[in-house]
Amino acid sequence: MTIMNGFELHYLSFVYAQEFSSKNNNLGGQMKHIIALASKIAFTLALLYVILDRVYHASFLSVMFIALFLGFVSYLSGDMLVLPRTNNITASLADFGLSFVILWVFVLTQTRNDFSPFGAALLSAACLTVFEYFFHRYLLKNVLDENFRNELSARDNTLQYQTEAADELFPETKEKHKE
């Protein structure tokens, strides 16, 4: 029986981890999305708790429900549909609009109206948009696969300018000049 030193043990664990990840490559991609979604919901809950519960006195259960709903909807629509087809700024603005509308309806229906629901929704959506900008950067760097990142960078860096050349609609002919 031989005793392994730290380097050999680290190397063997690295080799086994590589074999496991190559066999379960799809599982690793799914796990990245689950971790990203869970962190998004957790941060959304923390942010909405501070703004809506502490400042505007909404119930914690309502804030937790809206954080779950908003997290799922914005992850599926903004992060998985809009972000891959556009850029970070456009996806963040789309998330702002979506979260503003959802939060405005929530604040109108679930809280006491001794404050401006528009202001509460606007403040919450603006804070969430700042978080979304950095979250999108994280998604592009760590969660979305490398092929997608290469396609995105190639698409953004190769501008294709096109011009159109055509003849005139009614060209002047020599016969018309003689008249």
UniProtKB/Swiss-Prot annotation:
Keyword Ligase: no
Transmembrane regions: 33-53, 63-83, 89-109, 115-135
Subcellular location: Cell membrane
Keywords: Cell membrane, Membrane, Transmembrane, Transmembrane helix
Pfam family, one: DUF2512
Main location: membrane
InterPro entries: DUF2512
Disulfide bridges in this chain: none
Keyword Transcription regulation belongs to the record: no
GO cellular component terms attached to this protein's record: plasma membrane
Membrane topology: Multi-pass membrane protein
Domain of life assignment: Bacteria
Name of the molecule in the record: Uncharacterized membrane protein YndM
Organism listed in the record: Bacillus subtilis (strain 168)
